[in-house]
């Protein structure tokens, strides 16, 4: 692969009062160009990741990126969508443009504004990332979908509530030191483990602390070909970038194995010529704690049904053998859908150049990313390596 990350920007995630989707997009696009030291006239292509699905009345959003600078006018811009993996779909589109020699420098932006939407509509919008004939009437929205997955996992492998609480507590603890995170509070294991008025059950065995947040936010990357990147201030290369798409209906697959996730990881590791033991850390898609648990198994870190051991033994803690979600993950950082995949790449690049501040993994050399759309339907894995 020839694409490298040479600059980035990241907004705070959360309920951003007074912000608009346009402002979020413009700010990160401008800041990313400045961070890379790239002029708008040097950009060859632009990709915007924006899920929307009813969150914004402005559905045609591609050209909002051009508002960042008049010199971007007439540049080709494409908006992409692939459910909660929309951001990674945008990143991949940019990589492919560079790998095909169709572009030298690509601006990638991911953004979403969700918190201005009334609560009941949020659930309906998110369910659009499921197979509606089967799941369209699921109570509790997408939490209900993953509640069913968690219940099925418990039935097959036993009650895993201790492990889910440990995952939630880990990610909240990590998120305290992330300045971009929506929820910077260490709730602790006991709070996450116990049902309470402040932590009620939401769907099946999933409590509030098992669910990611509804968020506003944006992130951006500047991608460049390797020759250009090596002349820049910094360069983080894609050792691998893989995309695997699975069936949408859960009835057509074993939903407890996340086979698309497994396939994407296998292909990425083979492409990069590395193993999980070579990775310094992983940012993975913890839309719900049960998702992170199953992802441990799908990526090959644990055998089926044994992912809980990793959480309970501290293997995936920040000081563990393979830190998972040192950023706090979607659980603490927030999950503005179109921005999430781009954010994961920004924060991984920051780790690799030693600019991650309080969430820095000491000596990070190689970072893995898994971003998922739907219930393991759209699956993206990147492996990043600093080369400058």
Language model regions located:
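Conserved active-site "lid/cap" helical segment
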Residues: 1-85, 149, 153-160, 182-192, ...
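Condensing-enzyme catalytic core mediating Claisen C-C bond formation in acyl metabolism
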Residues: 1-22, 132, 165-167, 200-263, ...
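Conserved catalytic cysteine-centered active-site region
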Residues: 4, 52-109, 113-145, 184-213, ...
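Buried hydrophobic positions in well-ordered alpha/beta secondary-structure cores of metabolic enzymes
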Residues: 6, 32, 43-46, 87, ...
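Beta-strand segments within the central parallel beta-sheet cores of soluble alpha/beta enzyme folds
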Residues: 41-50, 76-82, 106-110, 162-169, ...
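Short glycine/threonine-rich loop-to-helix capping motif typified by GTGT followed
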Residues: 53-61, 250-254, 286-309, 320, ...
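Active-site-proximal alpha-helical scaffold in enzymes
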Residues: 81-112, 144-178, 221-227, 333-356
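Extended C-terminal subregions enriched in glycine
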Residues: 258, 262, 266-290, 298, ...
């Amino acid at each position: 692969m020839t694409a490298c990350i040479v600059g980035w920007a990241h907004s705070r995630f959360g309920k951003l009062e007074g912000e608009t989707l346009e402002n979020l997009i413009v700010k990160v696009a401008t800041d990313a160009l400045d961070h890379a030291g790239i002029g708008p006239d040097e950009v060859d292509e632009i990709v915007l990741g924006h899920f929307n699905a009813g969150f914004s009345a402005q559905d045609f959003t591609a050209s909002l990126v051009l508002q960042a600078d008049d010199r971007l006018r007439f540049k080709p811009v494409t908006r992409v969508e692939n459910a909660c993996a929309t951001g990674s779909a945008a990143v991949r589109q940019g990589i492919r443009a560079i790998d095909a020699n169709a572009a030298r420098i690509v601006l990638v932006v991911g953004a979403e504004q969700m918190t201005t939407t009334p609560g009941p509509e949020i659930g309906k919008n998110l369910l659009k990332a499921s197979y509606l004939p089967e799941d369209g009437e699921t109570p509790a929205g997408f939490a209900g979908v993953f509640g069913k997955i968690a219940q099925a996992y418990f039935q097959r492998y036993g009650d895993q509530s201790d492990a889910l609480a440990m995952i939630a507590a880990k990610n909240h603890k990590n998120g305290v030191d992330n300045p971009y995170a929506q929820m910077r509070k260490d709730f602790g294991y006991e709070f996450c483990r116990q049902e309470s008025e402040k932590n009620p059950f939401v769907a099946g065995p999933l409590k509030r602390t098992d669910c990611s947040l509804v968020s506003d936010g944006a992130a951006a990357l500047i991608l460049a070909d390797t020759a250009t990147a090596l002349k820049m201030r910094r360069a983080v290369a894609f050792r691998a970038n893989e995309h695997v798409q699975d069936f949408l209906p859960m009835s057509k697959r074993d939903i407890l194995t996340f086979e698309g996730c497994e396939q994407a990881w296998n292909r990425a590791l083979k492409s990069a010529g590395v193993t999980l033991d070579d990775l310094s850390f992983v940012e993975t898609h913890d839309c719900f704690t049960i998702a992170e648990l199953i992802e441990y198994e799908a990526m090959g870190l644990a055998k089926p049904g044994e992912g809980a051991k990793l959480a309970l033994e501290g293997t995936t803690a920040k000081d563990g053998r393979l830190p998972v979600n040192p950023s706090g993950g979607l659980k603490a950082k927030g999950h503005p859908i179109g921005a999430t995949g781009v954010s994961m790449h920004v924060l991984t690049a920051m780790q690799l150049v030693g600019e991650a501040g309080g969430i820095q993994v000491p000596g990070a050399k190689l970072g893995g990313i898994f971003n998922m759309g739907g219930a393991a339907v759209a699956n993206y894995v990147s492996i990043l390596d600093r080369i400058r």
